[in-house]
Amino acid sequence: MPRPDSPRTDWRPSRRDFLQASTVAAGGVLAGGLSLARSAHAAGSDVLKIGAIGCGGRGTGAIADAMNADKNSKLVAMADAFEDRLQGALKRIKTAFPDRVAVDQDHCFTGFDGYKKVLASGVDVVILAEPPHFRPMHLKAAVEAGKHVFCEKPVAVDGPGVRSVLASAELAQKKGLSIVSGLCWRYHHGTKATIERVLDGAIGDILVMQETYNTGMIGGRDRDPSLTEMQFQMRNWYCFAWLSGDHNVEQHIHSLDKSAWAMRDEPPLRAWGLGGRQVRTEQPRYGDIYDHHAVCYEYANGTRLYSFCRQHAGCWSDVTDTFIGTKGRARVLPSYEIEGQDKWKFKGEGGNMYVLEHEALFQSIRSGKPINNGVYMARSTMLAILGRMVNYTGQLLTWEQAINSQQDLSPKSYAWDANPPTMPDKDGKYPVAMPGVTKFV
């Protein structure tokens, strides 16, 4: 199956109507009754101006999905760290939507401060699809600027970042702004229907959940000697934990989020696990991230979530979600069914969840009923980060320890000649976390 965050190439207009209110409510917390008078755009039928921050494959796909979702929207500003990525995305979007792209070169911004210029360019809606490290910073700036936000997953790579996102989500609710998360399975009809039945008791009390995200190799690039260390790591962002969070955070969060949803977004008490780097050993190509993770999350009610993710070439792949309860079993991916006393199987169309999430966002803006996915997107991100923490350190850690972690993966400064937080040794090799040696901070 394609990765949930792989670039979208099908840019045909969606024929689906906007989500009904029940779908929107399940997709996030409705901040009903809040006035949009202080927000970026009044409800109605006016053109909504989109700004994009992060123009790689996911960013390009998200722009297309947004424009398919609302035919009265227009792309007016773009930012990316790299000029070639920005111009490539602009060319693709112009080809797909020739009459709805109003981005001149004066509204193409590059470098680490490009996001500020997008926010100052009169946009109503901002798409955040930059490397995950930057999302807390950019989300904070967007909300403070009064913009509605589509925020890709994950939303942070460390505890301070998660806490920042929670604060931004609270501010967005006070200001009547929408935040829609890129955790797209919450907007998939089959997933939503199945998990709603689980929440209604179709499998009884949940005893065990298993989330599996075992795929082939993703990411990795060879060093270009013309690049500074910061440029190389930014080009190869997926393979550096300070930028991506590691693959269990950047990818496996989609699976973990479904179990979080089934647990009503209540965090676990603690977690323990194991992980390592057996195949992804070529340096500097694969940076400092692991290639496999296994984590057990323990909840206060006795439920356990067993989480597995692996990126090895030439191996059996499996991306599935299974919940076992006192009355039956729920299979989300791939079959959307309940087995046991209350048998059921989803028969409808799943819908294009990549477009559906944007439909929900634009409908919320036009109706004056903002959506705020901020709490669950932050908690699901923290769930994944907790898994990385226990595997890197080899320790059992509580949720409270993790959410209050002081480990800040930010560099001292953002500049092309600055040192990233992870630097190679004299042989060009990066330090990799070692369980039992790496300390929890």
What residues fall within each predicted segment?
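Beta-strand-loop-alpha-helix segment that lines the small-molecule cofactor/substrate pocket
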Residues: P136-Y187, G201
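N-terminal Rossmann-like dinucleotide-binding module
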Residues: A25-P98, S259, M434-V441
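A structured beta-alpha segment of the ubiquitous adenosine-cofactor-binding alpha/beta core
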Residues: A96-L128
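N-terminal glycine-rich "phosphate-gripper" loop used for MgATP/nucleotide binding
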Residues: E130-P132
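Glycine-enriched catalytic-core subsegment of oxygenase/oxidase enzymes
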Residues: D65, K74-A79, L269-V441
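N-terminal secretory signal peptides and thylakoid transit peptides that target proteins
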Residues: D5-A26
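Predominantly a Rossmann-like dinucleotide-binding segment in NAD(P)-dependent oxidoreductases
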Residues: G54-G59, Q173-G287, H293, Y297, ...
